[in-house]
A protein has these predicted regions:
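Gly/Ser/Thr-rich active-site cleft segment
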Residues: 56-63, 69-70, 74-77, 148-150, ...
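ATP-binding/phosphotransfer module of carbohydrate and carboxylate kinases, centering on a glycine-rich
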Residues: 1-49, 169-309
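Glycine-rich phosphate-binding loop of actin/hexokinase-like ATP-binding domains
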Residues: 124-183, 270-275, 279, 284
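Short glycine-aspartate micro-motif
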Residues: 2-6, 54-58, 94, 129-133, ...
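Active-site nucleophile and cofactor-binding loops and adjacent substrate-binding regions
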Residues: 31, 74-75, 94-101, 120-122, ...
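ATP-dependent carbohydrate kinase catalytic cores
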Residues: 93-124, 217-224, 228
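A glycine- and small-aliphatic-rich helix-loop capping segment at beta-alpha/alpha-beta transitions
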Residues: 19-22, 75-78, 109-117, 145-151, ...
Length: 309
């Protein structure tokens, strides 16, 4: 059997596969409850009495991979790939960036698992694609000629052109607290949603989660404004990265935040913001924006990679 894992900064999701086409025993563990990736994997394997049955693994991590070392950006854990292989997965181990893991699932998705955002003049082609997913952080992976490219594009600074009106108030507050300019990941993430709400509501002690804030837009004016600003900023971010990648094959969005944030009522304004360019509007109009509606894209990508073990 092969262990499949999608390890973020907040949650680690596990399952196993016997045939590389289906998975079972899915489980989510909180990263904060363990001191290492080895402990997380071992805890899952023991829970399902799989320790002696699993000797291979495919693991996606919310971290850059620099040679043998993996250090998470938004969680206090790190590990050696070779060390993890020697300890638990001696017959084979693949470790990739978590968005790269998810990107391996894109080619196999059914139309029923996708929702097109607004009306574009194009349909997905064989051109470059990108997959973007806001979560604890902000991930982006490229897909070029079926090759997956991991990036850390969430750490780009936000251009001053985009920081105006209420966004300037929020940016100034962030700079005051953090003593640095905000990156897209600072704002287009769960922590960003909560920060927006705290600044707008002037309620530093709020216990609302990012999901509750985005879902309460009809009941709370500050929730509504938070959603409006995040929608705008995400669409403008996608405009920049789509132009950099020349992603005529489509911009794919995945994860619980975007599926809560981008509802049909904002499809058209989201598309209009994405297409807002004085020089490249025709190209942007031809790029499909596609929402991935499934919640197991990490496992689906891991299944594809498991075929290589």
């Amino acid at each position: 059997m092969i262990l499949l894992a999608d390890i973020g900064a907040t949650n680690a999701r596990f399952c196993v596969t016997s045939d590389c086409y289906n998975y079972e025993h899915s489980e989510s563990l909180e990263v904060i409850d363990s001191s290492s990736v080895e402990e997380l994997c071992d805890k899952y394997l023991k829970r399902y009495e799989l320790t002696n049955r699993v000797s291979k693994a495919v693991i996606g991590v919310a971290a850059p991979i620099i040679k043998d070392e993996v250090s998470f950006v938004n969680a206090n854990i790190s590990f050696s790939i070779e060390g993890l292989k020697n300890q638990l997965f001696q017959e084979g181990l693949i470790v990739v960036n978590d968005l790269a893991l998810q990107a391996h699932a894109i080619k196999g998705l059914e139309k029923s698992e996708l929702s097109f955002i607004g009306i574009s003049k194009g349909q997905p082609e064989e051109g470059p694609k990108i997959l973007v997913s806001p979560g604890t952080g902000l991930g982006l992976a490229g897909i070029v000629d079926q090759q997956i490219v991991a990036t850390e594009a969430g750490h780009l600074n936000i251009p001053q052109k985009e920081i105006k009106n209420d966004l300037k108030k929020i940016s100034d507050s962030f700079i005051s607290k953090s003593k640095r300019a905000p990156t897209y990941e600072d704002f287009l993430s769960g922590k960003g949603v909560r920060f927006f709400y705290k600044v707008l509501s002037e309620d530093e002690g709020t216990n609302l989660s990012s999901k509750e804030i985005l879902e309460n837009k009809d009941l709370n004016e500050d929730c509504s404004k938070t959603k409006e600003l995040i929608v705008y900023l995400l669409a403008s971010y996608l405009r920049y990265v789509a132009l950099v990648w020349g992603s005529t094959g489509g911009v794919y969005l995945a994860g619980s935040i975007v599926n809560t944030l981008i509802t049909e009522e904002v499809y058209q304004t989201f598309r209009e913001t994405f297409e807002s360019s004085e020089t490249m509007q025709d190209l942007l109009k031809a790029i499909p924006l596609i929402l991935v509606t499934i919640d197991d894209i990490g496992f689906r990508g891991a299944l594809e990679l498991s075929k290589k073990l």
